[in-house]
Regions:
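Beta-strand-rich extracellular passenger or scaffold domains
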Residues: 64-70, 91-94, 102-105, 124-127, ...
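Short, solvent-exposed linear patches
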Residues: 195, 217, 297, 319-321
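Classical Sec-dependent N-terminal signal peptides that target proteins to the secretory pathway
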Residues: 1-23
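Short, charged helix-to-loop "capping" segments that act as catalytic/coupling loops
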Residues: 110-113, 295-299
């Protein structure tokens, strides 16, 4: 009788045991992806390539957002797949809520409907030749995604401006300079195959160590603010994400470093077929590379600086540029700094492959004139030029040059001076 009961109990409970084992295996994959216990996300080996993790994303909310939470999110050179075939989400958030820096060394591919992919990790993200495929746009952020509980919309991101010693990344032995930081280390390949479709970088500490960040769409950079709002008319409630004031916190640096200062500016930087837009507040920026846009827009490269210092040691090249300097902001075009336009844009050829020949062989003093350069400078801000600025039309407030200090007497900055309308 006892044996019969034991068999019956075994039959009843065997499926449950198997299911538990299966879930445990799927919740943890090859030391690289571990799902947070509060997330319904599942990870498993890809059937075609077992070395590749396949993530079955969480169900979407009413606004098409699939919010996936992890303790670890790393991508090897084998890449990962975000399976969106069943969910059909418009936005796939991958948030690390309790883990160390995310290392992205492979391709992050969306299977099924293309989607906006967000990687969010307050302890930092390092992209080592990482790339994305079948994405509408990509967001890398050290901020916490904030979703409106009333209407399910993604409002924006909250960035930490300080960190407590109890932080897991801090305890792990990393210096404070590495916490809350986004780092890119890529090849110096200028090919037309872009790693990103439309890239958003949101962090108060950003560094391009070497190589290029290349996008066929816009490159948007946000730095210096605690709250980055992407939905107009919304606000992030301070009390909802209030920090504990009784814990001593160490301030994180607000800085953007584009390129290695000892590297070749022709072999590192940002390349976009659309616009490059940097929005920075209370930040120090160093450009040692080449910022290049092949877009026809008058604002193809746009720098919106508030209480920020921009040190340009490299190239800023486009048909049109817009520098908005406000609230004691300073733009220093250093002796090695050059602002102009790629010569090959005058040929009517918009393929970035032409820039390989251009940037490698043509000296900087033969760079073409930028078509339009707008300098919207507040009274307490200033542009100081010790390098090369070459534009056909220069737009300023009331044709005023008081906030522009040109220390190069041999350089005429513009051909025509115009008033900002």
């Amino acid at each position: 009788m006892k044996l019969r009961n034991a068999i019956i109990i075994g039959v009843i409970y065997t499926p449950s045991i198997c299911q538990a084992v299966e879930q445990t295996n799927y919740k943890y994959y090859s030391d690289h992806i571990s799902i947070n216990q509060d997330s319904s996300t599942i990870v498993k080996p890809n059937e075609i390539n077992p070395k590749q993790a396949e993530i079955l994303i969480a169900p979407k909310n009413s606004k098409g957002i699939s919010h996936n939470k992890y303790d670890t999110f790393d991508v090897t050179d084998a890449g990962i797949i975000l399976n969106n075939k069943e969910v059909a989400a418009e936005t796939i958030i991958n948030e690390v809520v309790n883990g160390a820096t995310s290392f992205l060394a492979g391709n992050i591919a969306v299977a099924g409907n293309a989607a906006h992919v967000v990687i969010a990790n307050p302890n930092g993200i390092e992209c080592h030749n990482c790339s994305f495929s079948n994405t509408l746009q990509e967001t890398l952020t050290t901020g916490k995604p904030v979703i409106n509980n009333n209407n399910d919309e993604l409002i924006g991101y909250r960035l930490e401006k300080a960190i407590a010693p109890i932080n897991k990344g801090y305890r792990g032995g990393k210096s404070i300079e590495h916490i809350g930081k986004i780092v890119f280390s890529n090849k110096n390949d200028r090919s037309s195959s872009h790693s990103f479709n439309k890239l958003n970088i949101i962090s108060n500490n950003i560094k391009l160590e070497n190589g290029f960040i290349s996008s066929k769409g816009d490159i948007n950079i946000y730095s210096g603010k605690r709250d980055i709002i992407i939905k107009e008319g919304e606000s992030i409630l301070k009390q909802e994400y209030a920090m504990r004031s009784n814990i001593k916190r160490n301030n994180l640096p607000n800085q953007i470093i584009l390129g290695d200062k000892n590297g070749d500016p022709k072999k590192q930087g940002l390349i976009s077929s659309k616009n490059i837009i940097i929005n920075a507040s209370d930040t120090t920026i160093y450009n040692y590379g080449s910022l290049e846009s092949s877009n026809r827009s008058k604002n193809a490269i746009q720098l919106n600086l508030n209480k920020t210092t921009f040190n340009n040691h490299g190239y800023i090249l486009a048909r049109g540029g817009y520098l908005d300097l406000q609230n004691k902001s300073f733009f220093y075009n250093m002796e090695s700094g050059t602002i102009g336009m790629q010569y090959w844009l005058n040929t009517g050829k918009n393929n970035n492959n032409y820039s390989e020949t251009y940037i490698g062989l043509i000296p900087k003093n033969t760079i073409s004139q930028m078509k339009n350069l707008t300098l919207d400078i507040s009274e307490d801000s200033k542009l100081i030029n010790n390098g090369v600025i070459n534009t056909e039309r220069l737009y300023t407030r009331d044709k005023n040059m008081n906030n522009i200090q040109n220390n190069r007497e041999d350089i005429k900055i513009y051909t025509k001076l115009r008033k900002i309308k």
